[in-house]
Design a protein with these regions (language model features):
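Soluble or luminal CAZymes and related metallo-dependent hydrolases
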Residues: 2, 6, 101, 195
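Residue-level preference for the first positions of well-ordered beta-strands
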Residues: 37-39, 116-122, 151-153
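A cross-family acyltransferase "interaction/gating" segment
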Residues: 82, 118, 129-191
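Helix-to-loop junction immediately C-terminal to a conserved catalytic motif
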Residues: 3-46
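Short beta-alpha junction loops
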Residues: 70-74, 125, 157-161
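Internal catalytic-core helix/loop-beta-alpha segment
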Residues: 90-132
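A charged, well-structured terminal subsegment
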Residues: 106-107, 111, 176-210
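Catalytic core of membrane glycerolipid acyltransferases/transacylases, capturing the structured
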Residues: 34-97
Length: 211
């Protein structure tokens, strides 16, 4: 595990250097360093966006935080598999959905939360190549419903789509910022659509253009 931690720290450093990534905390109490079970949910723009969110967390929190990523991308080669499973300890899910999915994509996420680990999640369910945030899938609601008091922290990733344009394998140097907002919790008897809208609105509010 020591070599994986070293490689993880190295990748975090490289990501910061290439993108100039900086964390901006808009939460009233500043960044959370308690390491309590949390879902960090963000707007997906590239296959490395979870890396920047992960790298922006304090090391003590990062060690207990696992990104959720698509198995269809990260299991396509031995190197990607190693990076995803050994370095990031990613929770890999099938994104085909529907009745054709071999397993419940939420099962592994539930297990991680049950073990006291946090997650990095992208509620849109797919990489969004447009400017507007897509409607959220119900997964984040179901996870919050199954874990009362679970903290959901919105993270708006700015400029990453231009750092890793679609089809690109080499990052384009460009300043990138991660905007962390106040944590949300599912309210008592709060309906699914209400929570999804509230979570989505909280994420959109962090976008610089929304200021």
């Amino acid at each position: 595990m020591k070599i994986e931690r070293l490689l993880g720290a190295t990748l975090c450093g490289l990501a910061r250097i290439i993108t100039g990534a900086r964390a901006i905390h808009h939460a009233a109490n500043g960044p959370d360093t308690t390491g309590g079970t949390t879902i960090y949910y963000a707007n997906p723009r590239s296959h490395i966006d979870f890396l920047l969110v992960w790298a922006a967390l304090p090391p003590s929190v990062r060690r207990r935080t696992r990104p959720v990523a698509g198995a269809d991308y990260w299991l396509t080669s031995p190197l990607r598999r190693y990076v995803a499973l050994r370095i990031f300890r990613a929770v890999l899910v099938e994104r085909s959905g529907g009745a054709q999915a071999a397993t419940d994509p939420l099962a592994a996420m539930q297990a991680a939360l049950d073990a006291g680990e946090s997650l990095i999640l992208f509620p849109e369910g797919t990489r969004n190549v447009g400017d507007d945030l897509l409607p959220f899938k119900s997964g984040i609601f179901r996870l919050a419903q199954a874990h009362p008091g679970l903290r959901c922290v919105p993270v708006w990733v700015e400029n990453l789509g231009r750092v890793m344009p679609k089809g690109s394998f080499i990052p384009v140097p460009l300043l990138c910022a991660l905007h962390f907002g106040d944590a949300l919790c599912l309210g008592d008897d709060e309906a699914r659509d209400s929570f999804l809208k509230r979570s989505r609105d909280a994420l959109i509010a962090l976008a610089p253009t929304a200021a």
